[in-house]
Amino acid sequence: MTYIATRSFTDPDSYYESIGGVGPVEGIITARGNFHATLTCVNFSRLWMRRGEDSLARVAIYTPRMARTTMMFATDQDQPARHIAGVERQPDEVTVVSLGSSEHVRTSAAARWGAVTLPPEDLAALGQAINGRELTPPSFTHHVKPSKSAILRLRSLHEAVGHLAKKAPDILARSEVARAMEEALQEAIVFCLASAEPVHVSSAHRHHARIMRRLEEALHANSNGPVYMSELCAAVGTSYSTLRDCCQERLGMSPKRYLWLRRMHLARRDLCRADPEKSSVTEIATSYGFWELGRFAVAYRTLFGESPSMALRRPPDDPKPGENAESPWQFIKSA
């Protein structure tokens, strides 16, 4: 069975939640402006792919599913470099995410990205069959630079699948077409990894990765209210200066700025989803530690382009799949 879905978004939270399948994704927009994004999801028999485009600079936190190996890349060369796990990555590199990690992906402008995932045992078998050696999941996230022909082939196939998913999903859903496209993508992935030059990662970089993973775990454990810096440093088990260096490296901002942006986005999420008859701006703002409501309202408008009260009153921009007959999702499933 092939699962195909395409969708457009104006709400970043709905966008990140919908990426799914490749693993939980959270995001924080770091630039002002009107957000819009598109997402294409195709799940073949073994290989799953995602293809997205988003309009504003952001930090996304990606936690891969334990049962799948994830490979991420830029879908075209003509865009700014991204920072993945604190290191600037060029558009012609592929990131192979380690199982059980939590990686930060930071962009400075609009981004066009692709991802493919495979069960580790399938990737190993494909490597053995196509290249004569098994391809095993890395113990830590690493970055490789494939040959020019290999990355161009991967991008071309990924784009072709994305085009069919949008313009002719009924054709892509045919078993013979889906099988051919899946096999071609799997071969392209193996050739990318087999032809690649590894990019060195230092031991200090891996230590910072562990600190950032503990940071995200601590934030998730306290996701329903404010988190104070002294408590956070204690939970992470490091000093503020070390945490500051890690956040600057991975997020491009201080931990205080990151916490503030995170609280603002959580407040926005709750405002956009709350029932205005049962909730108030004051209740939601104070639940995230914003006690000075006037300053909160000004900061909210500056960051999101509308007042908190407007966000509370208007209906959600991006209803979830199945909520109504006008769902923006387009689904196709083959037999």
Please annotate each region the language model reported.
Residues 1-35, 80-223, 228-230, 234-240, ...:
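Alpha-helical bundle regulatory/interaction domains
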Residues 14-19, 35-56:
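A short glycine-rich, His/Asp/Glu-containing loop-to-beta-strand
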Residues 45-47, 54-83:
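Glycine- and acidic-residue-biased ligand/ion/polar-headgroup-sensing regions
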Residues 64, 208, 260:
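Short, conserved glycine- and acidic-residue-centered signature motifs
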Residues 211-215, 259-264:
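Generic hydrophobic, amphipathic alpha-helix propensity
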Residues 238, 248, 257-260:
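C-terminal structural cap/anchor segments
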Residues 243, 247, 295-296, 300:
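Short hydrophobic/aromatic patch on the recognition helix
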